[in-house]
Amino acid sequence: MTAYLRWIALIAMCSAQLALHAVEPVKLQRLKVPAPPWPAGDERGMANQIGPATLQRCAWHVAEPGARTYELSQVRSNTMPLSPFAGPYVVKPKPSSGIPGTAHAFNSETLNEGAEPGQQGTQIDALGHFAVLKQPWDGKSPLPADEATYYGGFTQKDVKPTPDSPLQRLGLEKMPAIVTSAVLLDAKAYVGKGQVMKAGEVVTADHIRGMLKAQGLGERGILPGDVVYVYTGWGDQWRDPDTDKVYYSQAPGLAYDAARYLGERRIVAIGLDAPFIDPVPSGMLAGSAGPAPGTPAGLPFAVHHHMLTQMGIHHVENAKLDELARDKVWTSCTMILPARQKGAAGAEVRPVAIGAPEKLPRRSR
């Protein structure tokens, strides 16, 4: 019996150490971050939490022995998968140029007319990207844009007073540099049982709780100010050149209850290796199928609605998460730094994560 108890104690100790190896020290987890409600007129949302506490959590991961940098963006090109909701992205190289009277030569590119680079490829949504109408629009009458309301109660007149105006409020330039701790949830392993999640399949709040426990993050959980990345495996469908046109036609995503769960935990941003964050069943974009079960009526992109207009949480779409998941880097320091385009509703972004692969030994606490 004594030997048996010792064996149980050893297993418990090893399990505890495994959990500790995946997370920041408790003293860093307990550092206080600012909490809502935010001041009237706020345009930062949950990014108000970025500060000393999140920087210290981030710095711990950077200093971990064996820490490496992971690219979380897809390579952009003229033949990459393209969103059906944005103008085509075509980069046109210009001939090499020179400056008369000098020995200089230089190269540059232009974008095609109508291009929307901020909504193509790996990109981030500003809080002013999404609004909510008083009731569903029938698509036949003119869009009642004047009825739109945004995060913080801003009206259409506040945010976009004329059809051709940039965002006057909630534009991307209001977002601070996101430098904070991140959690990666491996939904391909937990929900998909090792297979790519199916189109329209959802990651629920219960799944998130289960993944945290399975990945040794049960005690840490999701901290205020975290960025959460969810690896669905759908990024495997990202092919360049995009000949089969599957990637943007459908996708797995977060369930509405998962969006509410993450919002309650005050994350700063959510990122998926999928194009919509929301689940999109096959046929939904063509109008031949409805949204995923559990989606509120009239809000087929309910996660966009909740995160952007209600909670002030940014979206990173088309993130590249396969290497982070392969190395089981469940927690890391992430940096998300889009261009500060004034009045922009979205931007190209090159997020990175810095963390130590799980297979490497971690330093003692």
Regions found by a protein language model. Name each.
Residues 11-21:
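Hydrophobic h-region of N-terminal signal peptides that target proteins for export
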Residues 23-365:
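Active-/binding-site microenvironments in catalytic and ligand-binding cores
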Residues 1-8:
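Bacterial N-terminal signal peptides that target proteins for export
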